[in-house]
Amino acid sequence: MPMTAQRSMTHGIRSSGLAVVGILAATPARAQPTPIFDGAPPASWIAPPGVPGDSFTVFHTRKTFELGKVPARFVVHVSADNRYRLFVNGAQVSSGPQRSDVTHWRYETVDLAPQLHPGRNVIAALVWNWGAARPVAQHSHRTGFLLQGNSSAEAALVNSGYGWRVLVDSAYAPIVITSAAMGNYYAAVPGDSIDGARYPWGWEQPDYDDSAWYIVAPPTQTSAAAPLAAFDNAAGGGIVGLAKRRAMQPGDYGEVTGWQLEPRSIPPMEETLQRLARVRRATGVTTDGAFLRAAGDLVVPAHTTATLLLDQSHTTNAYPVLETSGGASSTVRLTYAEALVDSAGRKAHRDSIGGRSVRGVRDVFRPDGGAHHRFQTVYWRSFRYVQMEIVTADEPLRVHDLHGIYTAYPFSERARFASDLPWLADMWRMNWNGARIGAFETYMDTPYWEQLQYVGDTRIQGLISLYVSGDDRLLRQAIEHFDLSRIPEGLTASRYPSAVTQIIPPFSLIYVAMVHDYYMHRGDSAFVRERLAGVRGILDWYARHVDSTGMLGPMPHWNYVDWTNPWPRGVPPGADHGHSATISLLYAYALQRAAELEAGVGMRGAAEAYRTRRASVLAAVRSRAWDAKRGLFRDSPDTVSYSQQTNVLAILTDAAPVAEQRALMERVLSDTTLTRASYYFGFYVLEALRKAGLADRYIEQLAPWQGMLRLGLTSTPENPEPTRSDTHAWAAHPNYGLLATVLGVRPASAGFRTVLIAPSLGPLRRAEGRVPHPRGDIDVKLEADGERGLRAEITLPAGVTGVLEWRGQRRALRSGRQVVRL
């Protein structure tokens, strides 16, 4: 690589004519930076020379150091832009950083001691920036890597900066995936093209010879032994310390530049071996699929084109790993799909392959002829099917192995549900798979198409997580990110992190409900208090849009409520031009929850103000949108249209009087002329079903999920057929409903301090399950006793009490196990 003068990494300041590995100070710029960890000097950000900070870049960096003996702990903090994988003596120890934005950039804390040994040790990192091809969810300041020792002992040996070695890896190129090419909106990662002839095989191993790599060195060292000059930290630009946001220091002027680092708030992602199930078809080569089990090689002769269709048997997220020998100048193309399609792009039963092909995201690997070379993409792929196309040149290619490394947020499945209706168990597995692969460092609407964390999706995903896993950390992450996304008007972004701002005002109302969900299931008044400024800003924005009718007037932005055919872009009548009963009711829904939040933290005046505002909105909707002749609420008083969405919101907000809600819900279910709710808004339909006293009909409303199973789906789709995405966790909400409605386990007070168990068995004669609770597990075993009786065996965690409700009867519940007959 030529050594030429270049622009430095630090905020437009130029180097003094020297080629540099760019270094950015880890503290605000001044001549004598203050240590940030236990006396440790600050590390520096490093990046390759001659590469614009916003361009596609993959680089490797290494640091060799000696230890007389291995300490009990050797703690470092590590980050990168866009992402990194960190190795110690050849073993991977960390990856990240956790996704966020530049002003809340994350770092991981890792104890390297288990991988160290006396003598020579090597830390190595793979770092990449997708550049212009980066996914919409990916924020970026510029390419860089940072490793900071926790104390002066670690810092002296391994702080990134002077003495590290760096190599740009020219083997990588992005395969840009466009929405136009995909035939639908695509916002996720590009594919990888990896040329084995250019790849520095073994770069992460301690015995690799890195002597030809660039050295990060002080600017005064310009000899051949140290061909790269470090950027002088005192010259300008920097970031706050790793441990916490730094207080102002003498000479500071409050300027914020570059990455503002904060610790990782969630655990490392799960990574486990996952083998493809089978070869469904093959042309150009014969195989029994042994290579998928690493039990025998697939040998593709020279000058051969072979195509294999591989089936995982279920949708998944995984890093594809290919191990080959020989085959110089050959090409292996992997194309990933959730389902196969016909020539018109239509899906059928997900097991069906006849007359169908794979279209989608792809990677290309080019073996160089070496032995046992292992290709792995920098990021994971989402798929059920993988099409493997191999074209060989003058040498045969030997494929030893092709497998995946499954990855997802490490949710454990603590909850369980069993009943005398067997297909519910199949649905549970489908839903939970969709929920798992819809969660990584954030929740994701779809892991294949977008990988974006949307408010509407996330509220449902968060409830599933709480009820099935009991882990609230990813939900806290989401609430914090949506709070950070707020624009000056007061609204949250519809999705965050996102490098492209999108505003869906109704999602801001759903955000209020999400904060309330957390309040009811976890309490944590300090966390809730921190969110209240955002909640108030949202509701104040809506208050400014209430017109003289008492309903919401015209509203800007994208007023999406639900994907349903009669509504263009999912926007209900009246949303854009005024008087949407649907969104006015959603506003009232949020006001009620905000009132409870304010009351819960002692803000009684604010709570009463929200109740008053809610009552005013509901009165306006009743007087203007109620159609007494139809016995339904119109979507807007200015149109003659009716929907499930509007009428279930009328039930959930008590716009419909309590005494009339059951009859209204019956009409919602039976009137086929109504605009129907999608899988997403079906969550609110089923919540209204319970509130209207019809929860015994919950199971019968799950017919669409039976249909999913009949189609061979292994995760829940975005919409009914034809659906873009086969994995959309917003449709996995019946796992929540089985626990919260059928078993009937819900908080009776904030923080889940007390429990309400109100079962609704419907057609079931037996149901049992477990719901994780902050203090332990709630176990419920129910058996129908005759036509109207119930035998309930219930165990509550220590310190938790509650109430059992059944057909108008109530029984107090204590901690521990108890048997109740009603």
Label every model-predicted segment.
Residues 3-17:
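Bacterial N-terminal signal peptides that target proteins for export
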Residues 15-25:
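Bacterial N-terminal signal peptides
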Residues 27-31:
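Sec/Tat signal peptide C-region and signal peptidase I cleavage site
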Residues 32-445, 457, 473-474, 493-497, ...:
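Extracellular/oxidizing-compartment recognition motifs
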Residues 153-166, 171, 385, 393-430, ...:
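Active-site acid/base region of carbohydrate-active enzymes
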Residues 179-180, 184-202, 344, 612, ...:
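Non-catalytic C-terminal accessory modules of carbohydrate-active enzymes
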Residues 309-312, 376, 442-455, 496-508, ...:
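Solvent-exposed loop and edge beta-strand segments that line ligand/cofactor-binding
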Residues 319-338, 386-391, 455-485, 515-525, ...:
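Alpha-helical support elements that line or immediately flank enzyme active sites
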